[in-house]
Each structure stands twice: as structure tokens, then as C-alpha cells.
Amino acid sequence: MHFKLLVVFVDDRKTEALMKAARDSGATGCTVINHARGEGAKKQTSFFGMALAAPLDVLLMIVEQHLSRRILEHLRDVGEFDTKPGTGVAFQLDVEDAVGVVRQAEKLAVAVEKEI
């Protein structure tokens, strides 16, 4: 079984909705890193040197490769990444090797068989 790592940067107000969307699309879990900061193409506004941007969360999900595109597209739709500027970014990376995912792999085996 081969995996992808989905990485999502999103306004913290959308985290719960995106976690639900990922699970509904086949993800078996998610790790959330709170209070991330960043800057996009447009420089953020500041007030006396302090950024006024909303806090971001980083969502990390290891998913089976055959399910990754469907999950990524569902995240895009729920998060409105392509329709509203500045709402978030999601991408996937290849996972060369992983340990500690035996339970997820067992659950995913049935879902992947249906998918392919």
C-alpha cells in the first residue's frame, strides 16, 4: 500500500469542517498544528508591527494514494480554496515509507478495493 501526505493550510475557523470533509472522503485521521503563520502573494496588513491575519491551522493527513485526489478535491470544495482568495492551500506529497499505520492500512484495504 502506498501513501500520500496531504498538507492543508487553512483559517482555524474552517478546521473542523475540513476534518469532517476529509473523513467523509476516506481519510482515517488527521493531525492539526495550531497557530501557524504565513504570508501569501499579498503582504499582510499589520498594526504597530503585529500581523492582523487570522491564525492558521496546518492539517496533516496520511492517506492511501488511490483516495488522495478525491480527498484533496473535497477539501478544495469545502474550504473554497479555488473560489475565494486567501481561504487556504492544500497539496499532497509522496510518502516514501511509514510506520505506525497498520490499523489505518487494514481499514483502507477494503475502501481501496472498491475504488480500483
Q: Language model features by range: what are they?
A:
Residues 1-116:
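Positively charged, small/polar-rich N-terminal and surface patches that mediate targeting and assembly
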